UniProtKB/Swiss-Prot annotation:
CDD domains hit by this protein: HprK_C (cd01918)
Catalyzed reactions: [HPr protein]-L-serine + ATP = [HPr protein]-O-phospho-L-serine + ADP + H(+); [HPr protein]-O-phospho-L-serine + phosphate + H(+) = [HPr protein]-L-serine + diphosphate
Region described as Important for the catalytic mechanism of dephosphorylation: spans on this chain: 264-269
Protein name, UniProt field: HPr kinase/phosphorylase
Binding, ATP: G153, D154, S155, G156, I157, G158, K159, S160
Gene3D superfamilies: HprK N-terminal domain-like, P-loop containing nucleotide triphosphate hydrolases
Keyword Methyltransferase among UniProt keywords: no
Free-text comment on this protein's domains from its UniProt entry: The Walker A ATP-binding motif also binds Pi and PPi.
Protein family: Belongs to the HPrK/P family.
Molecular function GO labels: ATP binding; magnesium ion binding; phosphorelay sensor kinase activity; protein serine/threonine kinase activity; protein serine/threonine/tyrosine kinase activity
Lineage: Bacteria, Bacillati, Bacillota, Bacilli, Lactobacillales
NCBIfam families per record: hpr-ser
Requisite cofactors: Mg(2+)
Alphabetically ordered keywords of this record: Allosteric enzyme, ATP-binding, Carbohydrate metabolism, Kinase, Magnesium, Metal-binding, Multifunctional enzyme, Nucleotide-binding, Serine/threonine-protein kinase, Transferase
Length: 309
Protein backbone atom coordinates (compact mmCIF):
# COMPACT_ATOMS: atom_id res chain seq x y z
CA UNK A 1 0.00 0.00 0.00
CA UNK A 2 1.26 3.49 -0.86
CA UNK A 3 1.35 5.94 2.05
CA UNK A 4 1.80 9.63 1.32
CA UNK A 5 2.77 12.56 3.52
CA UNK A 6 -0.81 13.85 3.21
CA UNK A 7 -2.18 10.59 4.61
CA UNK A 8 0.17 10.90 7.61
CA UNK A 9 -0.88 14.53 8.12
CA UNK A 10 -4.56 13.56 8.16
CA UNK A 11 -4.06 10.55 10.42
CA UNK A 12 -1.97 12.33 13.07
CA UNK A 13 -3.66 15.74 12.66
CA UNK A 14 -0.38 17.48 11.89
CA UNK A 15 -0.12 21.13 10.89
CA UNK A 16 1.43 21.85 7.50
CA UNK A 17 3.95 24.69 7.88
CA UNK A 18 5.36 24.28 4.39
CA UNK A 19 4.26 21.94 1.63
CA UNK A 20 2.33 22.15 -1.61
CA UNK A 21 0.22 19.42 -3.18
CA UNK A 22 3.25 17.87 -4.89
CA UNK A 23 5.29 17.63 -1.67
CA UNK A 24 2.34 16.26 0.32
CA UNK A 25 1.94 13.57 -2.35
CA UNK A 26 5.45 12.23 -1.71
CA UNK A 27 5.43 8.53 -0.81
CA UNK A 28 6.71 7.30 2.55
CA UNK A 29 8.62 4.10 1.84
CA UNK A 30 9.71 3.01 5.33
CA UNK A 31 8.15 2.85 8.79
CA UNK A 32 11.51 3.69 10.38
CA UNK A 33 11.74 7.18 11.88
CA UNK A 34 14.91 9.24 12.27
CA UNK A 35 15.75 11.39 15.30
CA UNK A 36 18.61 13.44 13.77
CA UNK A 37 20.79 13.96 16.82
CA UNK A 38 24.28 13.12 15.53
CA UNK A 39 23.42 14.63 12.16
CA UNK A 40 23.03 18.02 13.81
CA UNK A 41 26.65 17.81 14.91
CA UNK A 42 27.69 17.25 11.30
CA UNK A 43 28.03 13.45 11.42
CA UNK A 44 26.11 12.04 8.44
CA UNK A 45 27.62 8.55 8.15
CA UNK A 46 24.81 5.95 8.04
CA UNK A 47 22.23 8.73 7.71
CA UNK A 48 18.94 7.56 6.17
CA UNK A 49 17.42 10.45 4.19
CA UNK A 50 14.41 8.36 3.08
CA UNK A 51 13.01 8.36 6.63
CA UNK A 52 10.65 10.85 8.25
CA UNK A 53 12.85 13.24 10.27
CA UNK A 54 11.45 13.93 13.75
CA UNK A 55 12.75 16.90 15.75
CA UNK A 56 11.96 16.95 19.46
CA UNK A 57 12.85 19.14 22.41
CA UNK A 58 16.45 17.87 22.67
CA UNK A 59 17.24 18.47 19.01
CA UNK A 60 15.44 21.81 19.06
CA UNK A 61 17.38 22.97 22.14
CA UNK A 62 20.68 21.97 20.55
CA UNK A 63 19.81 23.87 17.38
CA UNK A 64 19.48 27.06 19.43
CA UNK A 65 23.16 26.80 20.38
CA UNK A 66 24.25 26.88 16.73
CA UNK A 67 24.86 29.93 14.59
CA UNK A 68 22.42 30.78 11.83
CA UNK A 69 24.94 29.58 9.24
CA UNK A 70 25.52 26.23 10.98
CA UNK A 71 21.79 25.62 11.43
CA UNK A 72 21.24 26.20 7.73
CA UNK A 73 24.18 23.92 6.87
CA UNK A 74 22.75 21.11 9.02
CA UNK A 75 19.34 21.21 7.33
CA UNK A 76 20.80 21.62 3.85
CA UNK A 77 22.76 18.40 4.36
CA UNK A 78 19.83 16.64 6.00
CA UNK A 79 17.12 17.37 3.44
CA UNK A 80 17.37 15.29 0.27
CA UNK A 81 14.99 14.71 -2.62
CA UNK A 82 13.88 11.37 -1.12
CA UNK A 83 13.20 12.85 2.34
CA UNK A 84 9.39 12.73 2.79
CA UNK A 85 9.06 15.37 5.52
CA UNK A 86 10.43 16.82 8.72
CA UNK A 87 8.15 16.97 11.77
CA UNK A 88 8.69 19.27 14.74
CA UNK A 89 7.03 17.93 17.90
CA UNK A 90 5.45 19.68 20.90
CA UNK A 91 4.30 22.63 18.78
CA UNK A 92 7.83 24.08 18.92
CA UNK A 93 8.70 27.03 16.71
CA UNK A 94 10.08 26.24 13.27
CA UNK A 95 13.64 27.61 12.84
CA UNK A 96 13.90 29.97 9.88
CA UNK A 97 16.90 28.03 8.57
CA UNK A 98 14.88 24.79 8.57
CA UNK A 99 12.08 26.43 6.61
CA UNK A 100 14.50 27.90 4.04
CA UNK A 101 16.44 24.66 3.53
CA UNK A 102 13.21 22.64 3.24
CA UNK A 103 11.85 25.03 0.63
CA UNK A 104 15.07 24.86 -1.40
CA UNK A 105 15.23 21.04 -1.27
CA UNK A 106 11.54 20.26 -1.67
CA UNK A 107 10.78 18.80 1.77
CA UNK A 108 7.48 19.31 3.62
CA UNK A 109 7.69 20.89 7.09
CA UNK A 110 5.08 19.67 9.58
CA UNK A 111 4.29 20.46 13.19
CA UNK A 112 2.73 18.15 15.79
CA UNK A 113 1.19 19.12 19.13
CA UNK A 114 2.02 15.87 20.94
CA UNK A 115 5.25 15.00 22.71
CA UNK A 116 8.06 13.41 20.76
CA UNK A 117 7.68 9.89 22.17
CA UNK A 118 3.91 9.90 21.68
CA UNK A 119 4.25 11.20 18.13
CA UNK A 120 6.95 8.66 17.31
CA UNK A 121 4.85 5.80 18.68
CA UNK A 122 1.74 6.86 16.77
CA UNK A 123 3.72 7.19 13.54
CA UNK A 124 5.42 3.81 13.93
CA UNK A 125 2.10 2.07 14.65
CA UNK A 126 0.39 3.64 11.66
CA UNK A 127 3.25 3.23 9.17
CA UNK A 128 4.00 -0.37 10.20
CA UNK A 129 0.35 -1.27 9.63
CA UNK A 130 0.03 0.53 6.30
CA UNK A 131 3.37 -0.52 4.82
CA UNK A 132 3.26 -4.16 5.93
CA UNK A 133 3.15 -6.81 3.21
CA UNK A 134 -0.37 -8.13 2.74
CA UNK A 135 -1.78 -11.54 1.81
CA UNK A 136 -5.38 -12.09 0.72
CA UNK A 137 -7.20 -15.13 2.12
CA UNK A 138 -10.72 -16.37 1.43
CA UNK A 139 -13.05 -16.25 4.40
CA UNK A 140 -15.04 -14.06 6.78
CA UNK A 141 -13.43 -12.11 9.62
CA UNK A 142 -15.68 -11.31 12.58
CA UNK A 143 -14.92 -9.61 15.88
CA UNK A 144 -16.43 -11.91 18.53
CA UNK A 145 -16.29 -10.54 22.07
CA UNK A 146 -13.32 -8.37 21.06
CA UNK A 147 -11.42 -11.26 19.46
CA UNK A 148 -10.84 -11.54 15.72
CA UNK A 149 -12.09 -14.89 14.38
CA UNK A 150 -11.32 -15.90 10.78
CA UNK A 151 -14.04 -18.22 9.43
CA UNK A 152 -12.96 -20.37 6.49
CA UNK A 153 -14.30 -23.43 4.68
CA UNK A 154 -15.29 -24.83 1.31
CA UNK A 155 -17.28 -22.68 -1.10
CA UNK A 156 -21.01 -22.80 -0.33
CA UNK A 157 -20.55 -24.12 3.22
CA UNK A 158 -22.28 -21.02 4.68
CA UNK A 159 -19.44 -18.75 5.83
CA UNK A 160 -21.18 -15.48 4.93
CA UNK A 161 -24.52 -16.65 6.37
CA UNK A 162 -22.73 -17.58 9.60
CA UNK A 163 -21.09 -14.15 9.62
CA UNK A 164 -24.50 -12.50 9.25
CA UNK A 165 -25.93 -14.56 12.11
CA UNK A 166 -23.01 -13.52 14.31
CA UNK A 167 -23.65 -9.85 13.44
CA UNK A 168 -27.32 -10.32 14.44
CA UNK A 169 -26.08 -11.73 17.75
CA UNK A 170 -24.20 -8.49 18.47
CA UNK A 171 -20.77 -9.18 17.03
CA UNK A 172 -18.97 -7.07 14.41
CA UNK A 173 -18.14 -7.79 10.80
CA UNK A 174 -14.63 -6.92 9.66
CA UNK A 175 -14.42 -8.51 6.20
CA UNK A 176 -16.34 -10.89 3.97
CA UNK A 177 -15.12 -13.04 1.07
CA UNK A 178 -11.61 -11.54 0.86
CA UNK A 179 -9.61 -10.79 3.99
CA UNK A 180 -6.31 -8.92 3.64
CA UNK A 181 -3.98 -10.05 6.43
CA UNK A 182 -0.66 -8.57 7.52
CA UNK A 183 1.77 -9.03 10.39
CA UNK A 184 2.36 -6.01 12.62
CA UNK A 185 5.14 -7.91 14.35
CA UNK A 186 6.36 -11.50 14.67
CA UNK A 187 3.44 -12.54 16.87
CA UNK A 188 0.54 -10.31 15.85
CA UNK A 189 -1.62 -10.84 12.77
CA UNK A 190 -4.22 -8.31 11.64
CA UNK A 191 -6.94 -8.46 9.02
CA UNK A 192 -8.97 -5.90 7.10
CA UNK A 193 -11.39 -5.88 4.15
CA UNK A 194 -10.49 -5.05 0.58
CA UNK A 195 -11.26 -1.38 -0.08
CA UNK A 196 -14.14 -2.18 -2.43
CA UNK A 197 -15.74 -4.60 0.07
CA UNK A 198 -15.88 -2.41 3.20
CA UNK A 199 -18.95 -3.29 5.32
CA UNK A 200 -20.41 -5.48 2.55
CA UNK A 201 -21.64 -9.05 2.92
CA UNK A 202 -22.78 -11.38 0.12
CA UNK A 203 -25.67 -13.71 0.92
CA UNK A 204 -26.74 -16.29 -1.67
CA UNK A 205 -30.33 -15.68 -2.72
CA UNK A 206 -30.36 -12.15 -1.29
CA UNK A 207 -27.34 -10.53 -2.88
CA UNK A 208 -24.95 -7.96 -1.45
CA UNK A 209 -26.03 -6.19 1.74
CA UNK A 210 -24.48 -3.20 3.51
CA UNK A 211 -24.09 -4.32 7.11
CA UNK A 212 -23.44 -0.80 8.41
CA UNK A 213 -26.62 0.56 6.79
CA UNK A 214 -28.78 -2.32 8.05
CA UNK A 215 -27.36 -2.86 11.54
CA UNK A 216 -25.53 0.39 12.37
CA UNK A 217 -21.95 1.48 12.98
CA UNK A 218 -21.64 -0.81 16.00
CA UNK A 219 -21.96 -3.86 13.71
CA UNK A 220 -18.72 -3.26 11.77
CA UNK A 221 -15.01 -2.75 12.30
CA UNK A 222 -12.40 -1.53 9.82
CA UNK A 223 -9.74 -3.96 11.04
CA UNK A 224 -9.11 -6.52 13.75
CA UNK A 225 -6.36 -8.68 15.15
CA UNK A 226 -6.74 -12.28 13.93
CA UNK A 227 -6.45 -14.58 16.95
CA UNK A 228 -8.40 -17.71 16.02
CA UNK A 229 -9.27 -19.53 12.79
CA UNK A 230 -12.42 -21.60 12.37
CA UNK A 231 -12.71 -24.10 9.51
CA UNK A 232 -16.21 -25.21 8.56
CA UNK A 233 -16.53 -28.59 6.86
CA UNK A 234 -19.40 -30.89 5.97
CA UNK A 235 -20.23 -33.53 8.54
CA UNK A 236 -19.67 -37.04 7.18
CA UNK A 237 -20.23 -40.36 8.89
CA UNK A 238 -16.94 -41.92 9.84
CA UNK A 239 -15.03 -38.66 9.72
CA UNK A 240 -13.14 -38.00 12.94
CA UNK A 241 -13.46 -34.61 14.66
CA UNK A 242 -11.83 -33.39 17.86
CA UNK A 243 -14.26 -34.07 20.71
CA UNK A 244 -12.13 -33.15 23.71
CA UNK A 245 -10.64 -29.90 22.47
CA UNK A 246 -7.06 -31.01 23.02
CA UNK A 247 -6.05 -30.72 19.38
CA UNK A 248 -3.24 -28.31 18.54
CA UNK A 249 -3.91 -27.55 14.88
CA UNK A 250 -2.47 -24.26 13.63
CA UNK A 251 -2.30 -22.29 10.41
CA UNK A 252 0.48 -19.90 9.46
CA UNK A 253 -0.17 -16.58 7.74
CA UNK A 254 2.54 -13.99 7.10
CA UNK A 255 4.85 -15.98 9.37
CA UNK A 256 2.42 -15.81 12.32
CA UNK A 257 0.86 -19.00 13.68
CA UNK A 258 -2.71 -18.96 14.97
CA UNK A 259 -4.78 -21.88 16.33
CA UNK A 260 -7.48 -23.42 14.15
CA UNK A 261 -10.62 -25.28 15.19
CA UNK A 262 -12.50 -27.51 12.74
CA UNK A 263 -16.28 -27.43 13.12
CA UNK A 264 -18.54 -29.97 11.36
CA UNK A 265 -21.59 -28.48 9.64
CA UNK A 266 -24.86 -30.40 9.33
CA UNK A 267 -28.54 -29.55 8.99
CA UNK A 268 -30.06 -28.21 12.19
CA UNK A 269 -26.77 -27.32 13.84
CA UNK A 270 -26.46 -23.71 15.06
CA UNK A 271 -22.98 -23.01 13.78
CA UNK A 272 -22.83 -19.39 14.99
CA UNK A 273 -23.42 -20.47 18.60
CA UNK A 274 -20.71 -23.13 18.29
CA UNK A 275 -18.27 -20.52 16.93
CA UNK A 276 -19.12 -18.22 19.85
CA UNK A 277 -18.37 -21.06 22.25
CA UNK A 278 -15.09 -21.83 20.46
CA UNK A 279 -14.04 -18.17 20.72
CA UNK A 280 -14.92 -17.93 24.41
CA UNK A 281 -13.22 -21.26 25.12
CA UNK A 282 -10.04 -20.06 23.42
CA UNK A 283 -10.10 -16.86 25.46
CA UNK A 284 -10.63 -18.88 28.64
CA UNK A 285 -7.57 -20.99 27.78
CA UNK A 286 -5.53 -17.83 27.31
CA UNK A 287 -6.58 -16.81 30.82
CA UNK A 288 -5.55 -20.18 32.25
CA UNK A 289 -8.96 -21.90 32.37
CA UNK A 290 -8.77 -25.12 30.34
CA UNK A 291 -11.94 -27.25 30.47
CA UNK A 292 -10.21 -30.15 28.68
CA UNK A 293 -7.40 -30.20 31.21
CA UNK A 294 -9.93 -30.06 34.06
CA UNK A 295 -11.84 -33.01 32.58
CA UNK A 296 -8.65 -35.05 32.13
CA UNK A 297 -7.63 -34.36 35.74
CA UNK A 298 -11.08 -35.42 37.01
CA UNK A 299 -10.96 -38.56 34.88
CA UNK A 300 -7.48 -39.44 36.15
CA UNK A 301 -8.58 -38.92 39.75
CA UNK A 302 -11.70 -41.06 39.19
CA UNK A 303 -9.67 -43.89 37.65
CA UNK A 304 -7.18 -43.74 40.52
CA UNK A 305 -9.98 -43.79 43.08
CA UNK A 306 -11.70 -46.77 41.42
CA UNK A 307 -8.37 -48.56 41.26
CA UNK A 308 -7.90 -48.13 45.00
CA UNK A 309 -11.40 -49.45 45.65
Amino acid sequence: MTVTVKMLVDKLKLKVIYGNEKLLSKPITTADISRPGLEMTGYFDFYSPERIQLVGMKEWSYLKTLTDHNRYSVFSNMFKEETPAVIVARGLDIPEEMYRAAKENGVAVLQGRNGTSSLSGDMSWYLNAQLAERTSVHGVLVDIYGMGVLIQGDSGIGKSETGLELVKRGHRLVADDRVDVYAKDEETLWGEPAEILHHLLEIRGVGIIDVMSLYGASAVRNSSQVQLAIYLENFEDGKVFDRLGNGNEEIELQGVKIPRVRIPVKTGRNVSVVIEAAAMNYRAKQMGFDATKTFEERLTNLISKNGED
